[in-house]
């Protein structure tokens, strides 16, 4: 599951990036990670508090690496596949699963994916943010099940 370089970021996220000294998606403390989850997801991701703390501590310990990766990705033109004719070459059936309330990568990305991927279909989950598999696991699983059933015949 990957956005393949198609990243029409929401005005909200671009504003947060502009107003922040660092990327809000890269936590520098366990509490930052909790804030990131709250911001990126519309529903609870169902992770217990102790696990969020542990994950946040690990992510904070790797913040410098994550910042470097973020910079490299944003500076590398090879990461921008939209409009380069790469995605239309993918003939495999593709499910585009998106949360309507995604505050990071807006739902308008779905239209771009459908244009670029000729053999795709989209499922947009209402009331779901950036992490549909964690926010709506049953709905996500059902979308995948129906997709796989349809392509298997």
Q: How would you describe each model-predicted region?
A:
Residues 1-29:
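Flexible "cap/lid" loop of the alpha/beta hydrolase fold
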Residues 32-35, 56-85, 89:
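Hydrophobic, aromatic-rich cap/lid helix
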Residues 77, 101-105:
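Acidic catalytic loop of the alpha/beta-hydrolase fold
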Residues 9-14, 51, 108-109, 135-137:
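Short aromatic-enriched loop/helix-cap "lid" or pocket-rim segments at secondary-structure transitions
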Residues 90, 96-98, 102:
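Short beta-strand/loop motif that positions the catalytic acidic residue
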Residues 7, 103-104, 131-135:
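A short, basic/aromatic alpha-helical/loop segment that forms part
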Residues 83, 92, 106-115:
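Short alpha-helix in the alpha/beta-hydrolase fold that links the catalytic acid
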